[in-house]
Regions:
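Extreme N-terminal starter segment of soluble prokaryotic enzymes
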Residues: 1-4
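Short hydrophobic segments within beta-strands
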Residues: 6-8, 88
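FMN-binding flavodoxin-like domain, especially the glycine-rich phosphate-binding loop
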Residues: 13-16, 22-35, 48-143
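Short acidic loop-to-helix transition motifs that present clustered carboxylates
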Residues: 36-41
Length: 143
């Protein structure tokens, strides 16, 4: 499976998670076509990928009004018809409905979103590993 990662990070936590996810996917035999910022996407890596992984951070007022940062930029990514996608967000206190909003936005680009996970910034490594495990388990093995 070939995957492209599109990341929006403010403090580095989401980038750290994305890098960990890319590394873990490579360890199980996936090819990473590129890791780029949502606002400066690598169009070639998106085109070459079977799976698009979109990650961003949660913004909001403590435990109310949470939303994925950069939804506008995400909604302007290129069309992803025929591609599968997975989403993740990093959060401090509560992700709220961030994954639902992120899933909806990526789905509108034409991708089939097969899952997502909210990663607590205090547990980036463990939650990134869980994300990869769930993602790999949800994708049929290609022969």
């Amino acid at each position: 499976m070939k995957a492209a990662l599109l990341i929006e990070s403010l403090t580095g936590n989401t980038q750290k998670a994305g890098d960990r996810i890319a590394n873990d996917l490579q360890q199980v035999g996936w090819t990473i076509t590129g890791v780029s910022r949502v606002k400066v996407p690598d169009f070639g890596s998106i085109q070459d990928a079977d799976m698009i992984i979109v990650g961003t951070w949660v913004h909001g007022l403590f435990v109310v009004g949470q939303a994925p940062w950069g939804l506008g930029a995400i909604s302007h990514l290129p069309a992803m018809q025929g591609k599968k996608a997975a989403v993740f967000c990093t959060f401090a206190l509560s992700p709220g409905k961030t994954l639902d909003k992120l899933t909806s936005t990526v789905s509108l680009l034409g991708a089939e979103v097969i899952g997502g996970l909210a990663l607590n910034r205090g547990k980036i490594e463990a939650h990134s590993e869980e994300f990869v495990t769930r993602l790999v388990d949800s994708v049929p093995v290609q022969v």
